[in-house]
From Swiss-Prot:
GO terms for cellular component: acrosomal membrane; chromosome, telomeric region; cytoplasm; meiotic nuclear membrane microtubule tethering complex; membrane; nuclear envelope; nuclear inner membrane; nucleus. This is SUN domain-containing protein 1. The gene is Sun1. The modification Phosphoserine is found at residues 48, 66, 139. It comes from Mus musculus. It is a single-pass type II membrane protein. Disruption phenotype: Mutant mice are viable, but display hearing loss at all frequencies.
Amino acid sequence: MDFSRLHTYTPPQCVPENTGYTYALSSSYSSDALDFETEHKLEPVFDSPRMSRRSLRLVTTASYSSGDSQAIDSHISTSRATPAKGRETRTVKQRRSASKPAFSINHLSGKGLSSSTSHDSSCSLRSATVLRHPVLDESLIREQTKVDHFWGLDDDGDLKGGNKAATQGNGELAAEVASSNGYTCRDCRMLSARTDALTAHSAIHGTTSRVYSRDRTLKPRGVSFYLDRTLWLAKSTSSSFASFIVQLFQVVLMKLNFETYKLKGYESRAYESQSYETKSHESEAHLGHCGRMTAGELSRVDGESLCDDCKGKKHLEIHTATHSQLPQPHRVAGAMGRLCIYTGDLLVQALRRTRAAGWSVAEAVWSVLWLAVSAPGKAASGTFWWLGSGWYQFVTLISWLNVFLLTRCLRNICKVFVLLLPLLLLLGAGVSLWGQGNFFSLLPVLNWTAMQPTQRVDDSKGMHRPGPLPPSPPPKVDHKASQWPQESDMGQKVASLSAQCHNHDERLAELTVLLQKLQIRVDQVDDGREGLSLWVKNVVGQHLQEMGTIEPPDAKTDFMTFHHDHEVRLSNLEDVLRKLTEKSEAIQKELEETKLKAGSRDEEQPLLDRVQHLELELNLLKSQLSDWQHLKTSCEQAGARIQETVQLMFSEDQQGGSLEWLLEKLSSRFVSKDELQVLLHDLELKLLQNITHHITVTGQAPTSEAIVSAVNQAGISGITEAQAHIIVNNALKLYSQDKTGMVDFALESGGGSILSTRCSETYETKTALLSLFGVPLWYFSQSPRVVIQPDIYPGNCWAFKGSQGYLVVRLSMKIYPTTFTMEHIPKTLSPTGNISSAPKDFAVYGLETEYQEEGQPLGRFTYDQEGDSLQMFHTLERPDQAFQIVELRVLSNWGHPEYTCLYRFRVHGEPIQ
């Protein structure tokens, strides 16, 4: 802002009612100055500027002395003699540098103002007059801002110079206050010298000014701002909690030091009482000298007097030096603080890395979206593949969490987390304190570093100890008579204080002697039971003697009789107590013996029962063996009789009746089992051929007559029509009854189910069952439910990876398992001609609950690939416990390296009543 050319104007003294009104003290919005100049026919002071509210400045004036005012008048007269052109080219900064510096009210400290006001009457100081226009006040309210942005002016001033100007004002006021008191210390003289230099320096640079500018709109706050704000709140909260914990540790350590000092205090009391007596005489001798000291000399330190401000600074330095020597507990607390700081820094780094990871994830998502836009087919295939594998992994993870984490480890994890929660809070305590030297001074909320050190126990709290004072210089002669009453009062106070100290020393010595006597008596009492009894007897004896001197002789005899009776009663009670003790010991011994016997009997009882059971079984076996011997002899006799009878029957045809001849004769009339099986197989083939031929010719089902004729044509006679119907019906019934004729309690349609959370991983093929534009949409795979469904055909099975797997089945009801059926397709139906994926060795376990890790074994079996496709396996014995959950554990297969197939698994048994 370009201000109009301005110079100071002083109206002539001859003008009537000259008020010294100048344009500098008027507003740019009034015409009073123009009217004043027109009325008195004065030369215009300066051109009227075009001012706005942005260019308004705060104008203040400082107090001037008479010499300064004369200098200003001379300067004014000089400036009036200069031509108008020179006045126009002169800048505002040059004119202000030539005048007396004026500093802003905002730079003037409250302390300097109060001091100058309080000493105005004594020192005849001219107070500063602040001239501010109401329009300027409104501008200050509306235009002031805290953003570091300057606009609308071309003379900003020097901020550093402004600070120096403020120092100058404070220094002048401090010097004036010190001179008004009539006393100046060394530090204040140094301050005065410094302010003189600053005054000269500030006169060169000129006055300062405050800039008022319009408020600007703040920039929009992003996500990083709020994240930093959240981190700051977390830091401050953790720091506050850590400060509380550390301060609590400090209080505990101070309490421990208090107890230690208390123990040491009792040992040093005797020595201190003697030293206090010696020091008391020295204090009396020193009292005379202190009584003659002046009030100014009592506040001297190292031979120099100090004012109140210097005393406060000196006390602060001593206090800081005292706190710098921290004891061992403070060092321990500091070490803990540094540990918390290091941990907090690691936590901050972890949060920053997490934020960086989030940013990288966002970039990855953006790249995936761009890929979807550029190559939709490839992106769709990758997305479906990723979703499928991700869904399977998610289900597996949930199953693992449900089985292992939530059911087994959740309670332990909760307990450990509760224990680690305070440690985690402590670890986050030093987030904002890394790299600082003093831990306690940086605590934001509970900053208790200014606490006074705890007073030791051996220090006397209720009295002033006389101590050696530093040697004071000879007193200076003061000619002011007003200080003599103060010196006399101070001497009286010191004398009374010394007397009180002496009295306290005497009382402390007496208390120390009494404490020593009491300690001796306590040591005597602590020597043992004999010392205690002796002390009690002495006290009782003294009391009895006193009572004997006071009471009459009758009372003494009564007391003696009462004492004798009391002793007799005590002796009786001791006898009874001794007897009770003996009886209780005997009872205790008997009780221990009975417990030992009972324990041994409890251990021997199962063994005895087992031995008795074995003896009974042995007797039973002996009786059965004797019966078998009798049966053996009877069988031998029967065999001999039969042999004789056969020989007699065939003795007519055979000479000698040998057994070999009999066997040859029977084999000629009968056939063996193998020959019968071959004949039956041929008969079945012939029957099937005849029935097939009949159906192809007639197109109808065969009748009973056709079946009989087919049997006759096959060359086998002796089978009637009814027998043929029975054979066919039995075969059809067995096939319709699930090929076993027994109830399958694992069948899904009958109420069975699969616990998929404990089954093995399904083996998935890479062949897509459904695809769209070459993108696979659905892969074929069977679930474990196929194992308990009745449909069996090649490929309709559950395959799991490897040769070992698990299958857990929940039965329709609780049963006593007795039989298990394993079914696989035959080799004739296999495309490869073998069934290497069939299970070989497997075991079955009974489980009480689905969370049980190891169940009760029900049997271990082997499936034969060369046998029938449906094979049944029986348990060795009926289990004692009923189960509703059965686990099939496949241990090996017949050689397939990648997977194992299960087609059908049945469970048979007896339901519980």
